[in-house]
C-alpha cells in the first residue's frame, strides 16, 4: 500500500543581519526515514533543539538525528505517517520489530508476554497531536481512540500506537527530554 497522505512541508524562518525576518527554507523535510518491512510508515524529522532555553540561531542539524530520543535537555519534532496495521498479528510483530531495530534502537522496547508488539518507554514528555485519521493509544491497563484534532500527553509511560482504522493516519510528535527523578 502506498502512502495516501500529502507530503509534509517544512517552512523555517530566520532573521537577516538587519533583524528582518525571512523564510530560510520551504520544502520537504530534510530527514525522512522509512522501513522497507513496514510499507507506508514514514518518519518526517522536522526540527530539534539541543538546549533549554533553545538557541534561536542554532544550526539546522535535524538530518543528523538518529533514534527516537531528543538530545539531552532538548526536543525533537517529528511527523509520522502510519499505514493501517496488518490483520495478521505475526506480520504486525515482524513489521514493528523491524521498525524498532532500524529506527528506534534507543527506545525501551523490552516486551513482556502478551503485550502489544509496539510497546515502548522513553524518558520524555511527548505531545502527540493527531493531524489526520484515527489512531489508538495503548497503555498497559487501557487504550483510547484518538481522532484528528485530539492531543495526547505521554509522560514516560509504557505505550504503543496502533492504526486499526483501515486508512492512513498522521501524528505530529514533540518529544521533550525528561527525567523520572523528583
Q: What are these model-predicted stretches?
A:
Residues 45, 51-68, 76-82, 89-92, ...:
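Terminal, intrinsically disordered low-complexity segments enriched in charged/polar
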Residues 4, 9-11, 15-16, 20-24, ...:
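Double-stranded beta-helix
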Residues 28-30, 78-122, 156-158:
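Conserved short histidine dyad/triad with adjacent acidic residue
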Residues 1-65:
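N-terminal leader/capping segments at the start of a protein or of a new domain
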Residues 114-148:
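A short beta-strand-loop-beta hairpin characteristic of the jelly-roll/cupin
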Residues 72-75, 83, 143-147, 156-180:
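Ligand-binding loop in jelly-roll beta-barrel domains
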Amino acid at each position: 500500500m502506498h502512502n495516501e497522505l500529502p507530503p509534509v512541508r517544512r517552512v523555517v524562518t530566520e532573521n537577516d543581519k538587519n533583524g528582518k525576518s525571512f523564510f530560510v527554507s520551504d520544502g520537504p523535510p530534510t530527514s525522512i526515514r522509512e522501513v522497507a518491512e513496514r510499507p507506508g510508515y514514514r518518519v518526517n524529522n522536522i526540527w530539534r533543539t539541543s538546549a533549554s532555553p533553545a538557541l534561536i540561531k542554532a544550526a539546522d542539524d535535524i538530518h543528523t538525528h538518529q533514534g527516537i530520543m531528543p538530545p539531552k535537555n532538548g526536543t525533537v519534532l517529528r511527523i509520522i505517517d502510519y499505514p493501517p496495521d496488518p490483520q495478521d498479528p505475526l506480520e504486525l510483530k515482524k513489521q514493528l520489530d523491524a521498525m524498532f531495530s532500524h529506527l528506534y534502537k534507543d527506545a525501551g522496547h523490552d516486551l513482556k508476554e502478551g503485550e502489544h508488539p509496539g510497546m515502548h518507554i522513553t524518558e520524555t514528555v511527548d505531545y502527540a497531536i493527531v493531524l489526520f485519521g484515527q489512531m489508538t493509544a495503548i497503555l498497559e491497563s487501557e487504550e483510547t481512540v484518538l481522532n484528528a484534532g485530539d492531543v495526547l500527553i505521554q509522560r514516560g509511560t509504557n505505550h504503543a500506537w496502533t492504526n486499526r482504522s483501515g486508512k492512513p493516519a498522521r501524528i505530529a510528535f514533540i518529544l521533550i527530554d525528561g527525567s523520572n527523578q523528583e
